[in-house]
Amino acid sequence: MFSETDGSRKAIGDVDVLFHAGLYHLFHLVLPNHDFIAHAVSTDALNWRRVNNALFIGDPGNWDDLMLWTMHVSPDPHHNGRWRMFYTGLSRRDHGKYQRLGLATSDDLFHWKKSPVHWEDHRGPQDPEPVKEALRRSRSTQADSRHAMFDADSCFPLEPDPKHYEASLDEGRRWVSFRDPFFYHDGTDGFLLAAGRVKVGPIVRRGCVALMKETSPGHFESQPALHHPHLYDDIEVPNVINVDGDHYLIGSIREDAKIRYWYTGKLGDPWASYHDNVLLAQGNYAGRVSRDDKGWLLWNFFSMNLSDRTAENLITPPKRLVRTDSGLLRAVTFEGIDAHLRQTVDTRCIHSLIEDVGPQVEICQADEGDLELTCQSGFQAFVFDEKLDHFRFQAKLETQGVGKCGMVFRLDPVTRDGYYLSLDLLKGVAQLRAWGTGADGSGEHMMQFASLQAGFWFSEDHGSAEVQLIAFGSYIEFSINGRVVLSLADQRFDAGNLGVYLEAAKVRLSNVHLQRLASPRQTDDHLVSG
């Protein structure tokens, strides 16, 4: 995981990852300045090393001289061994209110050169001649990661076509959406997707996936929207993938900060939505897909502060994308975490957390890896003896009766501060809370309680589920029947007891496995601090 350092007043923004020759290449925005696109590499998708930045804002007067926004890197279908980066740029001329798309190319993924543009610098027509001469002399004479050469025949920077999309600052929100490019090639034709907005309808319901077709190398023609759900303000960071012949459109929704998807049999047909179309729970945003030698991966940043997504952002481990027999997409645990598994913890060593309870029935039986737990009244937790920081817990959990159950982890046995994971196996609801104690004498504020994330699932087998809980550094992941339901980062608690809690309930745990994980080799701020 990595984040920007607090002292730098920077945070990670949208990400894009490409796997090539055994290396994962991570490109990401840097917030709030948006003045360059950073680049890092990894062999395991978990530990990263920063390399030279890939791209920079243009010099004053260029179309991208204010900010750089989301990018997408893919192989150039017209030139073997070359890579293309489509990216979003904002200009000072428009005060950052108009988004356009540009292109840069590279032969090695490390050294990038901006492609020619038709944009001209019209500043200062009344400037004194010495000032005009100084401006001419200061301009670069060749393309690089900052400067693009002029070509009147270039189609870049791309702008929204007013025939299909909002394209004027006089329309809609007075703020033109045309960002987050994604290049998709179906084997015959190439298409460029972008977050755009149709021209009609309620203003905050115009968000669509804009579409352009590559008619010749580096030249694109506008098409009608690939998908307009008639519901959202924007569909950010769109992606299209082909899985077993079906197409899936993945986008991030600003309204609830979730990653959703739609599906269709072939491009051009209407897009449909499943009853459950959320890939990752709230807080996971700007989802990007990439393919490695094992299949599709879903990447995103997690925002620990939903009220300000320009700060406290972390990149969590990727999720493997799989397709169910019924066609739904599911995010599952990235198998690379297995390399960090260490000692097995004896799950027969378990005890009740609260000793000073009144007369009631409490049962804790351990038999060959199975556990029978009962609490007749009130709250009780049964925790494993060993203190744990990083771990993976797996079990089949079965509830009996109508009581409540859940899990606790990184729990202080004295104050009982830690993480509380509420589980409703009948309705399919998981809710993670951080519950702690404030400063002495802080009155009503001494109780510290935060709802961190909620996730939902459907299962035919009510009251029973295969569960997996991973705590790896500040990363927390919870899966039900192999599907990731919760995925987040939180830094409140770092070690303590792990166990199962009951409220007037009886549960059975079978196939219980608990293993320590090696501590992450890198801190959350490793990449941004060097």
Predicted regions and their residues:
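Beta-rich carbohydrate-recognition and catalytic domains
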Residues: 1-232, 236, 242-281, 294, ...
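Hydrophobic membrane-spanning alpha-helices of multi-pass integral membrane proteins
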Residues: 286-299
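Short, solvent-exposed coil/turn segments at beta-strand boundaries
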Residues: 21-23, 293-295, 366-369, 427
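Generic recognition of flexible, low-complexity loop/linker segments
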Residues: 14-15, 199-200, 237-238, 286-287, ...
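Short, well-structured alpha-helical interface segments that form or flank functional binding sites
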Residues: 235, 284, 390
